[in-house]
Amino acid sequence: MHAFYSLALRLSPVLAVTIDEINGNRFLSPYQDQDVSNIKGLVTAKSTSGFYLRSTSPDTDNRSSESIYIYDSEAISQISVGDVITLSGTVSEYRYSSSNVYMTEITSPSKIEVSSSDNEVVPVVIGEDGLMPPTEQFSSLDDGDVYGLPKNASQISNENPLLQPSKYGMDFWESLSGELATLTGLRAITKPNQYGDTWVVGAWPSTGSNERGGLTMRSNGWSFSFFLGYVTLQLI
């Protein structure tokens, strides 16, 4: 009996949940380190190390992203953009540096089954005629002052606050984690760095604009309406 009880504690339950349930309405997934099954979604993009999956049955909660990254370089050969698939895997939180916010993803995907192909993939529009990011406040932890708490983005993951995407910049982008998006009216505000990454701002209201065409970071009214674009995706 004791041996059976010990084994049961080590076994991770396999849960049938949706993508939005996996992402949840906070920065970290409520299913972290748990095995999940029968995850259904539309393949929206592929990278060299995995692919992105969007729920085919979205909910009405704008705090929970409908998309998620599937991390596995071998799995990409089994699917194409536009496929509707189901799979199982393990929910993980990943960041490549302790100063970064975690990204929710599914690792070790298995039981990948394609139910249909050549489905239309429509990106979410951010900017004119689409979603607009908030422009005044960074997060619910800094009390309106980007130079105050949390002082670095990693503490967001420690507190794991409830997302408020219409109010806070970090929450807005987190609510779109893993999503394929079209951003309108992009304007570069820096030169490319050594990796070719460029900070840009889109066709949405922003604060801190300066005479050089860039954005100035300042406390109490700092804009969180720009971002760094660097991921290369396969969309066909």
Describe the predicted segments one by one.
Residues 1-16:
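Fungal secretory targeting signals
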Residues 15-236:
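Extended non-catalytic accessory segments flanking core domains
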